[in-house]
Design a protein with these regions (language model features):
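Short, surface-exposed amphipathic charged segments that create phosphate/polyanion-binding patches used
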Residues: 167-168, 240-251
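Gly-rich Lys/Arg/Thr-decorated short loops/hinges at beta-loop-alpha junctions or inter-strand turns
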Residues: 90-91, 170-176
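Short, well-ordered secondary-structure "scaffold" segments embedded in the functional core
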Residues: 86, 186-187, 217-218
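Short, conserved DNA-binding cores of transcription-related domains
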Residues: 1-85, 91
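Short, positively charged, Gly/Tyr-enriched micro-motifs
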Residues: 45, 58-162, 201-202, 349-350
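The DNA-recognition helices of helix-turn-helix-type DNA-binding domains
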Residues: 48, 128, 139-140, 211, ...
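Acidic/histidine-rich catalytic cores and adjacent linkers
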Residues: 34, 38, 43, 136, ...
Length: 408
């Protein structure tokens, strides 16, 4: 009765007979059997209960109470009285040819959805790193069979194989990672996009990217019916970069005290003034009093932030044209360069005032990928890296019927 209760409540192996439990050092050994039952011969289909022999299998299970658990499974082999075929009895807790339980395999799959390294997972489950990797490599993720109506693309620094950057394709509307590509080269992107039919590509309504020209050219060439949107973070960053270049150039004119004052105030100078506390606002006003050019650059930056509050494209276009004119006539070289960039990308920028999509979800995925890569000290195998990323977001992918998880 004690063993039965232990089985039901702790082992959760219903239908298994626990014969003996031993603890040696930090390992719990549980000796188990299956009850005798009628089996069907895999060759002729005849029913049999004849036992041929037994063999003991040592099977690793989930740790319990911070200790390793090992099942000693006395497995029967049945024999068919009609054709003589010998075969092992069926069980639900360990796959054929494996030395670990199904639930331990499932725990490996669950833990690899996190950003933990294979080494850390192996340590937590009392398994070797090679076992974790071998189990994980049974997972494969296919590319989506069709593209959704909203497609976003970005890159991250993966340094896998011979390529420095890998591309990530997402559906920000549904919050799904669609695919990871070996690189962001235009030739490879074109080759990938051509997998999808023209009809499917024509059904894509929105295409979102940063301000990298090959992405825009990809949108123009293959997603002719899609509205192109420049990610908000990237065009706002152009303004911040222009202001920062101006600040760094100006602070070099001054002595050590003021130079350090400008440098140490970087965060509050780039932050929107409406989000500053009173004490921070006073500090900013004192800094702007020191230099006229810095003051002009600061108010140009703030004027652009106000454009972001516009509720429609027409208002934003009017405000942006005014801002571009002011920037080009400001006498600040960094803002002239920045304003030219905004002119070149104006249509994609203004589209963001009509539609709610951005690359925010994609950037969030990139940040998580960076943590994964850092924890593992990098990846050399792209296929494994791709599967790990897609598996990490599999709770989202499972909502999409076009992406299937295949476990061998």
């Amino acid at each position: 009765m004690l063993y039965s209760h232990f089985t039901e409540d702790l082992l959760n192996l219903q239908g298994v007979i626990v014969k003996k439990i031993k603890k040696i050092e930090n390992i719990i050994y549980i000796h188990i059997e299956m009850p005798v039952s009628e089996h069907i011969c895999p060759i002729c289909g005849e029913k049999t209960r004849y036992i041929h022999d037994y063999r003991c299998r040592t099977i690793k299970d989930l740790p319990a109470f911070n200790q390793q658990v090992v099942l000693i499974y006395r497995q029967r082999r049945y024999v068919c009285h009609k054709c003589g075929k010998r075969f092992s009895e069926e069980n639900t807790f360990v796959p054929r040819y494996y030395q670990i339980t199904r639930r331990l395999i499932n725990e490996i799959f669950n833990k690899t959805e996190s950003v933990s390294s294979f080494s850390l997972i192996a340590k937590e489950l009392n398994l070797s790193v090679s076992t974790i990797i071998r189990i994980f490599d049974n997972i494969s993720y296919t590319s989506p069979s069709v593209l959704p109506d909203v497609v976003a693309i970005d890159e991250f620094k993966g340094n896998v194989g011979d390529e420095k950057y890998q591309a990530i394709i997402t559906d920000p509307k549904s919050g799904i990672v669609l695919d990871i590509l070996t690189d962001r080269k235009q030739s490879h992107l074109i080759q990938y996009i051509k997998r999808y039919s023209k009809e499917n590509r024509d059904n894509v309504k929105f295409f979102i990217s940063d301000m990298w020209k090959p992405y825009y050219e990809l949108s123009e060439a293959f997603f002719k019916n899609a509205t192109y949107l420049v990610d908000k973070y990237h065009y706002v960053r152009q303004i911040i970069w222009a202001f920062e270049r101006t600040r760094k150039r100006i602070q070099k004119k001054y002595g050590k005290q003021n130079r350090l004052l400008f440098k140490n105030s970087k965060r509050i100078l780039t932050k929107r003034i409406s989000k500053l506390k009173d004490e921070q606002r006073n500090r900013v006003e004192n800094l702007l009093y020191i230099d006229d050019e810095l003051r002009k650059a600061y108010y140009l930056k703030e004027a652009f932030y106000k454009i972001l509050d516009c509720e429609d494209r027409q208002t934003a276009k009017k405000k942006m044209n005014e801002w571009v004119y002011a920037a080009q006539n400001s006498g600040i070289c960094d803002y002239r360069t920045c304003s030219n960039t905004l002119i070149n990308w104006q249509n994609g920028i203004l589209n963001t005032f009509d539609y709610p999509y951005s690359n925010g979800f994609t950037e969030g995925c990139n940040n998580r990928v960076k943590v994964l890569k850092r924890n593992a000290y990098g990846y050399r195998n792209f296929k494994r890296f791709r599967n790990r990323i897609l598996h990490m977001f599999s709770y989202q992918k499972n909502k999409n019927k076009n992406n299937e998880k295949e476990v061998a």
